[in-house]
Amino acid sequence: MATRARLPVLVVLTITLAAAVSCGTCPPVPSITALSPSSATAGGSQFLLTVSGNDFRRDSMVSWNNSFRVTTFTSSRRLVATVTATDIAQPGTVLVFVFNLPEGGTTFVSGGIGLVSTTACRGKSSNAVSFTINP
């Protein structure tokens, strides 16, 4: 008859918090305070649009008339976007805003023991600023 040895079993419970969980509040909404230039002439050449404001991030995107443009982050207060000649081919007014991408579906958790609230953070859009394309 074979004998069975009882080996102690150690159960290790590991609790891992994903990097996407953090304490606090969702990142602030970006805001635009100025565009430079603030206007252009229809039929003009491609140019760089400087967007000044607050709460810009490395992944912020400039939207030109609801279409994202190639955007360069220079600081939390300044972005530079490429506006093509096609973008200013016709006179009119376009809306410019900055969009901060969601942080990977981030969920922020706050509260004490037994009191927890969660907030799903989504992408944030700034105020819209008008850009004039003159005839």
Predicted regions mapped to residue ranges:
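Generic detector of short alpha-helix boundary/capping microenvironments
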Residues: 10-15, 28, 39, 84
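Short beta-strand segments within Ig-like beta-sandwich modules, predominantly Fibronectin type-III
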Residues: 70-75
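Short, surface-exposed loop/turn segments at beta-strand-coil junctions that are enriched for proline
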Residues: 82-90
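Extracellular recognition modules
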Residues: 95-100
